[in-house]
Regions:
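Acidic/polar residues in short coil/turn loops that connect beta-strands
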Residues: 96, 122, 164-166
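Short linear motifs in intrinsically disordered
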Residues: 108-113, 146-155, 168-174
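Active-site and glycan-interaction determinants of carbohydrate-active enzymes
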Residues: 80, 100-136
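Residue-level detector of functionally pivotal "anchor" positions at catalytic/ligand-binding pockets or at interdomain
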Residues: 81, 140-166
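Predominantly extracellular beta-rich ligand-binding scaffolds that present long acidic/polar faces
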Residues: 1-102, 117, 124
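Short loop/turn microsegments at loop-to-beta-strand junctions
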Residues: 115-117, 157-159, 177
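Short, surface-exposed loop/turn motifs with a glycine/proline- and acidic-biased composition
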Residues: 160-179
Length: 179
């Protein structure tokens, strides 16, 4: 739930997410609000999906595809879910490990809110949900945050963000004075 798999290269199934079972009895897997982008895996004669999300069950009852639930995801090829987002997720700086979503990303406010029940914060500890719906991936975009900079007596620059007691970021605080 709410994860990103990026630029993985494997010899087995699914560079992003891969599911294989010799006996699928009782197995259930759910992929929801995730981004799988730029992953590769070997070509094989069995399996369903693509290099980013792939599942197969050689020598089983053929039920593995029925036991893997793919909810809202962002993948380059729409072969795993009718609701898949296939546009570039627009990471801030994937080359340097920043997988936060940039402004204009199709993954912002595109997730399945019920899937995150019980998970109130993102990987940075910021409140989920910010906006119309949960974002895909591990980071929630907090657009338009109220950020101020101030110079202290020592000449240091301080960044200030405002939050409610519930941890919700305030985008337009109406406060003044020294604290």
């Amino acid at each position: 739930i709410n994860c990103t798999a990026y630029d993985n290269h494997v010899k087995g199934l699914g560079g992003g997410f891969g599911f294989q079972s010799q006996n699928a009895d009782g197995m259930r897997a759910v992929v929801s609000n995730c981004i799988a982008w730029g992953n590769t895996c070997r070509d094989d004669d069995y399996g369903t999906g693509n290099a980013n999300i792939r599942y197969g069950n050689a020598q089983t009852d053929g039920e593995l595809p029925n036991r893997v639930t793919i909810n809202v995801v962002c993948v380059p090829e729409n072969t795993v879910s009718a609701s898949a987002i296939t546009s570039d997720p627009m990471f801030v700086d994937a080359a340097n490990g920043n997988f936060r979503l940039a402004e204009g990303s199709p993954c912002i406010d595109a997730g399945d809110d019920p899937a995150i029940e019980g998970y109130d914060t993102d990987l940075d500890g910021n409140a989920r949900i910010f906006g119309a719906a949960v974002d895909l991936g591990p980071y929630e975009v907090n657009d338009g945050s109220a950020i101020e900079t101030a110079e202290t007596n020592g000449g240091e620059i301080v960044r200030v963000q405002y939050y409610t007691m519930q941890g919700i970021e305030v985008t337009s605080p109406s406060v003044s004075g020294l604290y």
